Amino acid sequence: MTELTPGIAAPLGAYYDGNGINFSLYSAHATGVELCLFDEQQREVRLPLATRSGDIWHGYLPGGKPGQRYGYRVHGPFDPAQGLRFNPNKLLLDPAARAVEGPVADDPYLHGGYDRPDRHDSAELMPKCVVIDEAYDWQDDCPPATPWGKTVIYEAHVRGLTLQHPEIPQVLRGSFAALGHPVMIAYFKRLGITALELLPVQQHSSEPRLQRLGLINYWGYNVLAPYAPDNRYSSLRTDMTPLREFRDAVKALHKAGIEVILDVVFNHSAELDTDGPTLSLRGIDNPGYYWLTPDGGYVNDTGCGNTLRLDQPQGVAWVMDCLRFWVGECHVDGFRFDLGSVLGRTPAFDRDAPLFQAMLADDLLSRCKLIAEPWDIGPGGYQVGEFPGRFAEWNDHYRDDMRRFWLQGDISLGQFAQRFAASSDLFNQRGRAPYASINMLTAHDGFTLQDLVSFSRKHNQLNGEGNRDGSDRNFSNNHGVEGPIADDAIVQRRRASRQALLATLLLSQGTPMLLAGDEHGHSQQGNNNAYCQDNAITWLDWATADDSLTAYTAALIHLRQQIPALQHDRWWQEGDGNVQWLNAQGQSLSAQQWEQGDLQLQICLSQRWLVVVNATQQAVEMTLPAGDWQLVAPFTQEDSRAVLPAWNQAAHSICVLVKKK
């Protein structure tokens, strides 16, 4: 009979040291823990995890090898009104598992029980944790450490980005390996992006509701095992594990100077609400991991059924250990925190919350880019501009105001300039820098750029929610007809709007984030919440990509990298030579023009680059500042130099000129 020796309390999870496996699990309220080992025939051996150090239960399995499948059964009181939901009939996943095998089924046997513990054993239906050998040869890999001022982020989905790429071997498409394939790296370099921000790559499951509809959670925000690379993104080659494949991709991207940022989910878990399955945290230490209501229910500040509690030492330690794993063992360069306000709840939002303090003080995380989605749906959850220290934040003010400027025409030049200048009204405080504003026009959540100019309302019927899901506040404009099919005049107006929006994004101060596919003209057919569409709606179609738009985008990124005012990451000040704001006549704007003037503007950057903006319905003749000006790529206008200093700027357009030295 296999027996455990005491082992050690750290690290959490299952760690193979070359001679055996150390198992370590946190539970403050349990009365007992059983380690459950499974062979290839799913036969189970239960071993008491008898040694307890504080609230950590641990044991060592001599001779244990990588590939060992395991889970836990945790004993303790079942008293939902007090927040306690222990049920040893339910096999539980290790919250620190490095690998997980098998899907989560939609089955009532996974439920832990309502008023009394459910008696059905869930082991046969449950995924199993898998012990891995974490050794890896990183060779001479080192982080690119791109300065914020030079950073251009590209948000992408591992599967959707490469699944239909004709130049990538079919066995690799949609996988981690495809991200590091020479074809993709060459594309990233041509485009000019410096950081790849990946939608969640951690092992996740699809909600029971989606499974019943024949859909899946495509985006991956229903995270099951935050340490484990998702098997769905493995090429399934016999000599390759998901972790090794992910590391190989990171190493290849780093060699090309491209950073890797992970979208991580520490706001809720895949266990959902009281009707959800008992898979891990709920059965291990429910009150330790979740915010609970006075009657033992779940606080739902996330809209996903539960809210993780991260104000206590163990919750902080769990998240920190996970982040350190991804940085230390996988060499990632940063994180984007989904519904990031949850990280600072105590339960009200506090920028000095324990988790924030731990992250900002950690030596390993000090080199990482930290990006918050600065809201959740709970009380006081909207916290744009309020995150601490080195955090950057998704700026929805930028997104909405720039859409309104170009597609609705209902904001002032002053508002436009405020957003163009890194939203200093939101971020120029407490010593923060312009990079803190993550400027975006689109993201995975919402319309693509092509749909933004082709649809005036959402079309989410395929999601199975009666088109009730997704935002109705899009500030989009179909330019005269709903949908992709339109006459040439409308197509041209849409193209002009796309170009103006892209130029604005890539020439604004702050950190630009480009949604993968926007440079192709990718459409999701009007679906602005395609979280459950693992099909041609979300997969990029490389065969039909708009190559001219891609070239236009790449030229804009190249232009951005030439303008010092966009690189040095310091707030623009009056008279510092970084920016000068001029009206159509080449004069300083009056207060009235800032608030009520026509949407026409000249922005001189670094005393040499002139951004000419006309968001009105008609062409306008502008008087350029003194100097010998020349149009720069990607902008074109026949015989433009012949009419200087008068300049005729087309309706709904933007261009850049450079002053000859």
From Swiss-Prot:
- Any one Gene Ontology molecular-function term assigned to this protein's record: hydrolase activity, hydrolyzing O-glycosyl compounds
InterPro entries with a match to the protein in the record: GlgX_C (IPR040784), GlgX_Isoamylase_N_E_set (IPR044505), Glyco_hydro_13_cat_dom (IPR006047), Glyco_hydro_13_N (IPR004193), Glyco_hydro_b (IPR013780), Glycogen_debranch_bac (IPR022844), Glycogen_debranch_GlgX (IPR011837), Glycoside_hydrolase_SF (IPR017853)
Active site per the UniProt annotation: D338 (nucleophile), E373 (proton donor)
SMART domains attached to this UniProt entry:
Aamy
Q: What Enzyme Commission number(s) apply to this enzyme?
A: 3.2.1.196
Q: Does the record's keyword annotation contain Thylakoid?
A: no
> Which residues are annotated as site, described as Transition state stabilizer?
D445
A Pfam family for this UniProt protein?
CBM_48
Q: Which domain of life is it from?
A: Bacteria
Annotated metabolic or biological route of this protein:
Glycan degradation; glycogen degradation
Any keyword Hydrolase?
yes
BP-aspect Gene Ontology terms: glycogen catabolic process
Which reaction equation describes what this protein catalyses? Answer: Hydrolysis of (1->6)-alpha-D-glucosidic linkages to branches with degrees of polymerization of three or four glucose residues in limit dextrin
Keywords for this entry?
Answer: Carbohydrate metabolism, Glycogen metabolism, Glycosidase, Hydrolase
Disordered, as annotated region: 460-481
The top EC class is: hydrolase
HAMAP family annotated for this entry? GlgX
- Role summary: Removes maltotriose and maltotetraose chains that are attached by 1,6-alpha-linkage to the limit dextrin main chain, generating a debranched limit dextrin.
Q: What is this protein called?
A: Glycogen debranching enzyme
Q: Which gene encodes it?
A: glgX
